[in-house]
Regions:
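Adenosine-phosphate binding glycine-rich loop
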Residues: 259-260, 265-312
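Rossmann-like adenosine-cofactor binding region
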Residues: 195-277
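Positively charged, low-complexity intrinsically disordered leader regions
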Residues: 1-54, 58, 126
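Short, structured coil segments at secondary-structure junctions
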Residues: 63, 93, 113-115, 171, ...
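Glycine-rich phosphate/diphosphate-binding loop of Rossmann-like nucleotide-binding domains
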Residues: 46-58, 142-223, 231
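Active-site cofactor/substrate anionic-group-binding motifs, chiefly glycine-
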Residues: 40-41, 45-93
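Anion-binding alpha/beta catalytic cores of soluble intermediary-metabolism enzymes, centered on
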Residues: 95-167, 264
């Protein structure tokens, strides 16, 4: 597999390899590694970022490479140059590309037209690098045996929900998405895809509107911001009202297992999708989760540039 364009492209063997490598990088954070020595990685972002940019640049540096950060308005794409032409130019100068943008189709085309590995750092439809960081964190807390555990996402049925369901299906997990019906529910096609993967992996995929039922007995409660970049501001009041029952509160956390954890991909809006007492409380693992953005991107670059991921 040359690229990581979508979460669904990963096999279970790929994920296990990446998580093991990320855990190794985390245990030896200052170990010298020259996998990207004399190599350059382009980091192209049309969406502002804190974690993805920092994680990507430090991941490249930890592997001995040189990162080049490119803003959306730095390229000629905005003036009519094609994605195909841009992909060929970047491929000629760089050894890998990490992209964070809006349209999944742009990432897919960049992957198809590039001769170098392309990594999806986030789109409106998917967020594979975040899910790898999430699962390293889950394994640190619960180990590799997840039998009998339930992993629950609450809130907007967005790109994180999609990636959460797909990765959970790949991992053979019991995953739940608790979201409103209608326009803020996860894409039905993605849910169907997750269930198809689950039929082979033994996973259990649930989508519900009942936040309390979802939280009961959960090992993980996970959420994301309610207003993502690009969401229409005119819908804010309506969306906030629809999502209010899915806020992660102390009362909701009381329904979970004794050893449960709270996760959030960040940035967070305390008082909206999560209470401050939860995200800043003893069950929150958000800082370690954010740290693993670097270790997992580092693992991706290490294995993709060596041609060691097989895909599904």
């Amino acid at each position: 597999m040359k690229d990581l364009l979508r979460t669904e492209h990963l096999s279970r063997a790929d994920v296990d390899l990446l998580l093991d490598t990320a855990a190794d990088f985390a245990s030896k954070p200052l170990r010298s590694n020259t996998a990207l020595s004399n190599k350059t990685v382009a980091i192209y972002m049309t969406k502002p970022s804190t974690r993805t940019r920092l994680a990507s640049e430090t991941a490249v540096a930890h592997l001995g490479g040189t990162p080049i950060f490119i803003r959306g308005d730095d390229l000629q794409l905005g003036r009519g140059e094609t994605i195909a032409d841009t992909a060929k130019i970047i491929s000629g100068f760089c050894d890998a590309l990490i992209i964070r943008t809006f349209k999944q189709s742009d990432v897919d085309e960049l992957g198809a037209q590039s001769s170098i590995p392309v990594i999806n750092g986030l789109t409106d439809d998917d967020h594979p690098t975040q899910l790898l960081a999430d699962w390293v964190t889950i394994r640190e807390n619960f180990g590799k045996d997840i039998k009998g555990r339930k992993f629950v996402y609450l809130g907007d049925g967005n790109n994180m929900t999609h990636a959460w369901l797909i990765m959970g299906a790949i991992m053979g997990a019991h995953v739940v998405a608790a979201t409103p019906d209608g326009k803020w529910a996860p894409d039905a096609a993605i849910v169907a895809k997750a269930k198809a993967i689950a039929a082979k992996s033994g996973a259990t995929i649930e989508v519900t509107t009942d936040a309390e039922a979802a939280a009961k007995g959960a090992s993980v409660l996970y959420t994301d911001v309610w207003m993502s970049m690009g969401d229409p501001e005119a819908e804010r009041a309506e969306k906030m009202k629809a999502l209010a029952p899915y806020a992660v509160t102390e009362n909701l956390m009381k329904l979970t297992e004794k050893d449960s954890i709270f996760m959030h991909c960040l940035p967070a809006h305390r008082g909206e999708e999560v209470e401050a007492s939860v995200i800043d409380g003893p069950k929150s693992v958000i800082w370690r989760e954010a740290y693993h953005r670097r270790t997992t991107i580092q693992a991706l670059l290490y294995h993709l540039t060596r041609g060691e991921l097989k895909g599904n």
